[in-house]
A protein has these predicted regions:
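Hydrophobic/aromatic-rich core segments of domains that either
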Residues: 120-121, 125, 130-136, 146-155, ...
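N-terminal accessory/pre-domain segments preceding catalytic cores
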Residues: 1-133, 140, 147, 178
Length: 204
């Protein structure tokens, strides 16, 4: 009989060590975080610790615990319910499915909501098929519009229905990650039909 899978078995020690180091540097900030982690399942708590261990200090200071909890809970659920996600190398899962940040965008809860919206459309699909379907969904929900403001969160692009290339790619990467498809944002320098770098998304 096969042994049951252990969530983040290979990286557990590294995550705990880096989280404790962050907490040591910011004890007053992490005290309430530790209290809230005690109310989470072991897997969700570990996912949250990964986010806090490797996020920039600005994210720690600017956003409440509940924002990151959404990313952690969705990531754990994907790992438990989708064998394709559970089979991913841990480094790919951590960096390109679970992690909350894509670029320098505003961070807001979105993963659980996006999964609920997209999930039925990709039922039974492999990653490649799911990626195409997610791309179609994103095209239905948001179109290109040039802006100069700070990069919006993925959920704000969805609600507004448009965004510049960087915002559209942040939206799409979050949508892909919300259903377990590993993805990241990439830039194409000297893109022929625009003035500067052109943002897109890349499946890992």
């Amino acid at each position: 009989m096969a042994e049951p899978r252990v969530f983040l078995k290979e990286n557990r020690g590294r995550i705990e060590e880096n989280y404790l180091e962050q907490a040591k540097n910011l004890p007053r900030v992490f005290a309430p975080v530790d209290e809230k982690l005690q109310k989470c399942t072991e897997e969700v708590a570990l996912a949250c610790k990964y986010l806090y261990a490797f996020m920039p200090y600005s994210d720690i200071g600017n956003y409440p615990f509940e924002v990151f909890l959404d990313y952690a809970e969705n990531g754990v659920r994907l790992w438990k319910e989708n064998p394709q996600v559970a089979d991913l190398p841990e480094e790919i899962f951590l960096n390109y499915v679970l992690f909350h940040r894509v670029n320098e965008e505003e961070i807001a809860q979105c993963r659980t909501y996006f999964r609920a919206e997209i999930g039925s459309r990709i039922q039974g699909m492999n990653f490649r098929e799911a990626a195409l379907e997610v791309n179609y969904w994103c095209a239905e929900e948001a179109t290109y519009h040039c802006t100069d403001d700070r990069t919006l969160s993925a959920i704000s692009v969805y609600r507004r229905g448009n965004g510049r290339c960087g915002e559209e790619s942040v939206f799409t990467v979050n949508a892909l990650r919300s259903v377990g498809v590993p993805a990241r944002q990439v830039y194409a320098p000297k893109w022929s039909h625009c003035d500067d770098n052109h943002a897109g998304r890349d499946l890992v």
